[in-house]
Amino acid sequence: MKRTLLFVLLCAFPVLSLSYACGSNGNPGSDPENDAYEPDLSTLEGQWRDSVHTALSYAYRGHVLQIGQNKMPIWWTIYGKKPADGRSLYISLHGGGQTDASENDEQWENQKQLYTPSEGVYLCPRAITNTWDLHFRPESDAFYEQIIQMAVVFLDVNPNKVYLMGYSAGGDGVWQEAPRMADHWAAASMMAGHPNGVRLESLRNLPFMIWCGAEDAAYDRNKVCAEYIGKLDALQAEDPQGYIHEGHIVAGKGHWMDGKDAAAVPWMAKYARNPYPKKVVWVQGDVTKEYFYWLGVPAREAKKGNMLRADIDGNTVTIGDCDYSSVRIYLNGKMVDLNRPVKVVHEGKTLFEGTLTPSDALRKETLFTRNDLSYSFPCMIEVKL
């Protein structure tokens, strides 16, 4: 197939520096060698914060989100003193599932008291339905994104310290939402849930914990969770720099683990999201995405099971396995040296090589498209495969 490439540069709009930017080690910081290409963005960030404030002030005041006909009540409390780099956010999904609303409401109330982080916002959403998949409906993802946006703007949350956890049906939700929204989370922990055949490759850059009682035999949860711990072991054996995980099949415990799983909270807190990992593995799940970390694909080609692998080494981006006709690569000065040419290769062939010109308009476009302070990019390369 003939290979062509397109380099997109947009210019207009003077802008300022992003808060909570992360270096390649996953910790908040900057790359002094490329600061010339990271001007102070507070004007753009301020515009974004204002837009979120306008859109979500009703949710902050009323403790309920609404998208279309769906409503998601949200409850939160704040623990500890706010760190200099912003609060953590723990999104904790309740049990229940295919039952009546009152039982799911009871499980939501129970979840509010289940875990106590030493620091951060502990937030429990009430699922939008009363179905077995109540936490990972196709409509759910947009609610989780809005929870994060609201928490960043109204509660001083650091978007690189957002954690996902859930028990029973909430654990079912974590199994699905952790990989398909992996670029949003700093770490995730699944408690007493069933994976329902989910693929795990997209967890490459997301620390992930699995908890299940050894006697939790309903739906073979104990056996399947042990199997999935083995799957993560195998993925990490093939890729030792990725797939940080820990699995616990708790001896003598059934579906209720008597609080043993609370150890997940300090474990997750050790990690901060790195929005710019050097290597990305992306497998589309039941809810398909157009963007993942610093990659973009044609929306019409985003189908369940489609794979994309890419990595950055110095100023070279290598595209590996790819089920798309084209790929968009979003870059900033924390990822590559923008003073030098950038190269994109695939199967040993150079698809693009050239010096990139940062675009203020692209920064704005990507920020308001992704609605994440870390995903405002000044440069983009699109290559056709």
Language model regions located:
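A domain-start/cap signature at the N-terminus of enzymes
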Residues: 22-88, 352, 357-378, 382-385
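Active-site machinery of serine-nucleophile hydrolases
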Residues: 86-152
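Primarily recognizes the serine-hydrolase "nucleophile elbow" in alpha/beta-hydrolase
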Residues: 160-204
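Acidic beta-to-alpha connecting loop that harbors the catalytic carboxylate
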Residues: 96, 127-128, 214-217, 252-253, ...
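Bacterial N-terminal signal peptides
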Residues: 8-17
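The feature captures the conserved acid-bearing segment of alpha/beta-hydrolase catalytic domains
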Residues: 187-269
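Gly/Ser-rich "nucleophile elbow"/oxyanion-hole loop immediately N-terminal to the catalytic nucleophile
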Residues: 80-85, 132-168, 180, 184
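Alpha/beta-hydrolase-fold serine-hydrolase catalytic core, especially in secreted/extracellular enzymes
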Residues: 29-35, 73, 233-385
